[in-house]
Amino acid sequence: QLCLLQPLGSGGFGSVYKATYHGATVAVKQVKNSSKNRLASRQSFWAELNVARLQHNNVVRVVAASTCAPASQNSLGTIVMEYVGNITLHHVIYGTGDVWRQSEDDEGGCGRKALSMEETVCYSCDIMTGLAFLHSQGIVHLDLKPANIFITEQGVCKIGDFGCSQKLEEGLSQSPHVCQQGGTYTHRAPELLKGERVTA
């Protein structure tokens, strides 16, 4: 049913692979069972599943998940997601890994094109639409940054990597100490940096 094809990347809580699942191309995230911080590993795995039942064009869709893993692997669980490619907004902004944006008559002298105004507006609208949907479902991402915005071959932005996300109780906000203070410090929400409550 599930066949790993090639690694796409790795991070603090696990590795991501391109794979096939029931014949369809998918992305598979294996959350590692960290011996240093087991609670954080578990929280990251379950946080990824905050969006498991949600479907939106600007949010990476979870297809399946399992806590079963081969004994030889130090994995807490496996999450199967739609495959949206391996290009992120980070690649596009900083010119890394974005083969499809190379240009001979580059504007910045770095061999890459600057984002056009149309692309900038389209990407911004996609991200805001995805965020508005997540917030309407009571989900806050808590690690929104260019590296977690995936861009499909059709140029659609999809928000991914929900390992730091929180599902807020209806009508309530959470104090910052309730949230796992994960995520990237330089991209942390202003209210968290100021010690205020998290709201959607």
UniProtKB/Swiss-Prot annotation:
Query: Would you say which domain of life the source belongs to?
Result: Eukaryota
Xref: Pfam families: Pkinase
Q: Which InterPro entries match?
A: Kinase-like_dom_sf, Prot_kinase_dom, Protein_kinase_ATP_BS, Ser/Thr_kinase_AS, Ser/Thr_Kinases-Pseudokinases
ATP-binding in keyword set: yes
Ranges where the Protein kinase domain occurs: 2-200
| PANTHER family in UniProt | SERINE/THREONINE-PROTEIN KINASE TNNI3K-RELATED, V-MOS MOLONEY MURINE SARCOMA VIRAL ONCO HOMOLOG
Q: What is this protein called?
A: Serine/threonine-protein kinase mos
Specify the species.
Ciconia nigra (Black stork)
Q: Which gene is the coding source of this polypeptide chain? A: MOS
